């Protein structure tokens, strides 16, 4: 009479597994929504840089100072952000981050002075770096199975890109309607854009705080808390060579992404109107879900690190194309290159956190590891805006951007070498473990 038991257990196991999968994907979708809503307001320059310079009456260099300061705050926040992610409930950190970022955006919409802009960007660095960053990445790593790391991180970056693209499309429509249909000033149009992003952040934050963490995540956090020892765990992480190679890859890959922030100004310098350049850069944003999710899927199907290497090589060559193609006078080729770079950089962003799984880092200190990688990997936030501002002010027009994109391409070569080295180490470890 006991024979039917296994069949019953099988029927019980399948719904449980499906329920677990649905729960994990639902959690991922919430994180995608939060990540997609919070960052665009900080980086409106990638679509509206020329407009921002006019509205706030600042120079390229002053805009560079603002983003350099933002990057410095990020740099100082990443390590404690990892510590917070290991110690405090993520949903409260995310709620605070979204609401604070949105509230600062409302101040931003009033077109404050340079001093006010410095305060806003500094506080944005805390609200999106200290309390938000590592908690989101750690939660994704926790809810993804080992075989799903590329897919989940790809969905995170690609999905947030989809959210960003949707918001950017609506924002550009508002801006075009205000400035072209209603003949309002650029300042009025820009204010509508900022309002959109600010209120969306606040609304999503209020929704997310009402949702409780799954019991499994709460239990994991409790176990981690009892085992946490900062100095011991730092020493453990420092001794992992693969972690430093991942750090180098993130550092170089982030250079590629930073270059895309200047595409709007670059295209306007090539003769496009603000709306046309904004349209092209918005199309580029739509490459994020394709590049992020597609890159993650290919990474899980083949190899995260191998797909990443291919993407790094292609985007490096495309950066060289931005230097060469303008001389050919083919605007269509230039636009295609800009969109292709967007596709590849988003694939890179979707993959370089997935390869962290190859470092065999204990889950209880994953947040700390993310903090360490972020401190060095996102160091470009502190100096690339200064380099870009200096070169475009010192050498106006195509010459300045040729120098800038040439530097980015050189760093892309270094990133490719780091990725090749990491793949060699991973393959060597696998070979040794098989006992061959």
Q: Which residues does each predicted region cover?
A:
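Cytoplasmic membrane-interface "Motif A"-like loop-to-helix N-cap segments
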Residues: 87-98, 300-313
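Glycine-rich segments within core transmembrane alpha-helices of 12-TM secondary carriers
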Residues: 150-176, 374-385
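Flexible cytoplasmic inter-helical loops of multi-pass small-molecule transporters
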Residues: 5-6, 212-232, 429-435
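Conserved MFS/SLC helix-loop-helix module at the cytosolic interface between two early adjacent transmembrane helices
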Residues: 76-114
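C-terminal transmembrane helical hairpin of 12-TM major facilitator-type secondary transporters
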Residues: 303-355
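Extracytoplasmic gate region of multi-pass secondary transporters
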Residues: 45-49, 168, 240-292, 384-385
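C-terminal membrane-cytosol helix-exit motif in multi-pass small-molecule transporters
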Residues: 176, 198-221, 418-423
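Helix-to-loop junctions at the C-terminal end of transmembrane segments
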Residues: 77-89, 291-304, 392-393
